[in-house]
């Protein structure tokens, strides 16, 4: 119950403006550049649940929050289905919010944009949307509906290309740039290291097989009676 409470106490973006109006570095109680421990405490998720996606050259971690089941008949339930928090060296650089289809059913794109504008101000003109702030796979699978931008942060509202699902991405521009560079380098290093790791794994598999065979032999030899 603690996990649900920790997230639901925050004011819903779809139910009106927050006291942190037009602060693009914040989503509800979560502030960009916060630590894993800080985000975990605010969400009710244990910090130990954070997964390390890459350990070098920088530590990239992800912490997931998922909404508990709520009776669909409760119309005041939180519209958020899940949230993914991503960290660069223990600093929150991206928040990806996915809204429940049940809670956004019937809402138009403009309905969502108007609600977010109450918190973040007017979005930038469509011609000024910075698509480079978004990963290529995100742009491939989603339509950008609106964006809020300043020098340090960006907030982008997306809709799935193939389904009526809305997402909100809140990101730190400088940390996102550093994280992307680190992730590319991590992938490169992993590829270089793959042959060695595969050889070590094969060696370990052989050793494990031999150890298991020796254990069975020892057990059966002791118990065997002609």
Would you name each region that the model predicts?
Residues 6, 22-24, 84:
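Short, functionally important structural connectors and interaction interfaces within domains
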Residues 12, 76, 86-88, 137-139, ...:
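Sterically constrained small-residue positions within well-ordered secondary structures
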Residues 6-16:
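Bacterial N-terminal signal peptides
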Residues 22-57, 99-226:
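Non-cytosolic coordination micro-motifs
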Residues 1-4:
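Positively charged n-region of N-terminal signal peptides that target proteins for export
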Residues 17-21:
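Sec/Tat signal peptide C-region and signal peptidase I cleavage site
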Residues 60-107:
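Mid-chain, structured segments of secreted extracytoplasmic proteins
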């Amino acid at each position: 119950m603690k996990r649900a409470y920790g997230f639901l106490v925050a004011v819903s973006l779809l139910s009106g403006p927050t006291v942190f109006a037009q602060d693009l570095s914040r989503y509800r109680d979560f502030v960009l550049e916060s630590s894993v421990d800080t985000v975990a405490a605010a969400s009710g998720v244990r910090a130990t649940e954070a997964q390390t996606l890459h350990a070098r050259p920088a530590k990239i971690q992800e912490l997931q929050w998922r909404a508990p089941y709520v009776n669909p008949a409760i119309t005041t339930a939180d519209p958020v289905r899940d949230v993914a928090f991503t960290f660069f060296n223990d600093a929150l650089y991206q928040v990806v919010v996915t809204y429940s289809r049940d809670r956004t059913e019937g809402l138009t794109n403009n309905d969502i944009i108007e609600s977010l504008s109450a918190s973040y101000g007017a979005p930038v003109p469509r011609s000024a949307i910075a698509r480079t702030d978004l990963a290529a796979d995100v742009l491939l699978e989603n339509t950008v509906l609106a964006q809020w931008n300043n020098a340090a942060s960006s907030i982008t509202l997306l809709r799935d290309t193939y389904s009526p699902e809305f997402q909100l991405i809140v990101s730190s521009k400088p940390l996102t740039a550093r994280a992307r560079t680190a992730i590319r380098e991590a992938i490169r290093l992993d590829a270089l290291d793959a042959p060695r790791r595969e050889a070590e794994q094969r060696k370990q598999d052989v050793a494990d097989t031999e150890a298991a065979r020796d254990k069975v032999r020892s057990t059966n030899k002791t118990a065997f009676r002609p």
